[in-house]
Design a protein with these regions (language model features):
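Acidic-enriched, low-complexity/disordered segments with a strong bias for Aspartate over Glutamate
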Residues: 7, 38-40, 49, 103, ...
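Helical scaffold of the NTase/Pol beta-like nucleotidyltransferase catalytic core
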Residues: 1-23
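Conserved NTP/Mg2+-binding pocket subregion across the NTase superfamily
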Residues: 59-129
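Short glycine- and Lys/Arg-enriched binding-loop motifs that mark or flank ligand-binding interfaces
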Residues: 22, 27, 81
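Catalytic metal-binding acidic patch
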Residues: 26, 30-58, 85-87, 91
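Short secondary-structure boundary/capping segments within folded domains
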Residues: 13-15, 31-35, 79-80
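Short linear sequence motifs
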Residues: 5, 21, 50, 54, ...
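Conserved NTP-binding catalytic cores of kinases and kinase-like/nucleotidyltransferase enzymes
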Residues: 7-12, 25, 44-69, 76-77
């Protein structure tokens, strides 16, 4: 189920000029996910604030049962529970989130494991943790 979802997100991001990179973090990136795990995505975009304000992009991937916004410093997350049972956290960050030297929070998230889905600007190509 999540594989098709990730493919759909990648296609959307490839076609969307506002999206610079998409990565998976958390248990799916580490390969420790269980049937109850949510999918944690980080989306690098210079349009973070606009996407937080207008969350319609989340509707492109399925029918929504519930949606909430969560604030974590440089990352604003839109957590979505889809009617098909998937729970997805879209972490929206500005490109400065990946600026070197990485801040402590970014370093922790990435050190725990990440998987690049799309990297138009090659932010993750030579990233040293």
């Amino acid at each position: 189920m999540y594989e098709k979802f990730i493919d759909a997100v990648k296609q959307w991001a490839e076609e969307n000029g506002r999206i610079e990179s998409v990565i998976i973090v958390g248990s799916y990136a580490r390969g420790t996910n269980t049937v109850t795990s949510d999918l944690d995505l980080v989306i690098l975009t210079p349009c973070r604030d606009e996407m937080v304000e207008n969350q319609e992009f989340t509707e492109l991937f399925g029918k929504i049962a519930k949606r909430q916004t969560e604030y974590y410093g440089a990352c604003t997350s839109v957590r979505v529970w889809y009617q098909n049972g998937m729970e997805v956290e879209f972490g929206l960050v500005k490109p400065s989130w990946i600026s070197v030297p990485l801040d402590q929070g970014t370093h922790k998230v990435l050190s725990d494991g990440y998987k690049v889905i799309l990297d138009k600007k090659s932010y993750f190509l030579n990233l040293k943790l």
